[in-house]
Amino acid sequence: MTAPPETAPTDAELLAASVRDGDRFTAVYDRHYAGVHRYVAGRLGPQAADDVVAETFLTAFRRRAAFDPSRGDVRPWLFGIATNLIAQHRRTETRRYRVLAKVGADRDPGGHDDRVAASVSAERLQPSLARALAALSRKDRDVVLLKALAQLTHEEIADVLGIPYGTVGSRLSRARRKLRAALPAPTEGL
């Protein structure tokens, strides 16, 4: 008989092990860095994201002994730390949305193929979307961006923000309704 295959340790197990051996935290970092970075970059822009993500993982490392797995998983805990740090950088985020609403997003100076591949309708929509996001309340914007950028589940968003599961659905529904009302209707053929 062969032994059953070993399963990879869970995030909570790695975090607990990292209390005794700090090097074990590297696995948590490796598993979640890209997702946290994508979320923060979408909120604050790529330049601020590097600093905020570094601060997120430094905070998580410092608080790893206090992590309580009975209150939720490591992934939403990390996104909660990131969301709290984003709140400290909120003025930058709001300014960014206002600038995007006025001038559109920075154009990627990529090659000709990249420019051709860019969707005309997305380019046209970006200032309107930025304006609509800036108009949402902070609470509604947090839920929308945790869903859209971090791709968290309703349950994970509830854990991150410390709100009931049903409130996530209510805020998301309200925010989507406001965004739909604020955005131009899709145009046929684009």
PLM feature spans:
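Short, charged helix-capping/linker segments at alpha-helix termini
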Residues: 2-4, 19-27, 37-55, 189-190
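Arg/Lys-rich amphipathic alpha helix in sigma70-family domain 2
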Residues: 62-69, 80-102, 114, 122
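Short, Lys/Arg-enriched C-terminal cap helix and immediately downstream tail that follows
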Residues: 91-94, 141, 176-190
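Helix-turn-helix DNA-binding module
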Residues: 130-145, 150-167, 178
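Short amphipathic alpha-helical boundary/capping segments
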Residues: 13-16, 128-136, 182
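Structural recognition of an alpha-helix C-terminal capping motif at a helix-to-coil junction
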Residues: 51-58, 62, 72-84
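Residues within the DNA-recognition helix of helix-turn-helix
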Residues: 32, 128, 171-174, 178
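Acidic, proline/glycine-rich intrinsically disordered inter-domain spacer in sigma factors
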Residues: 2, 106-134
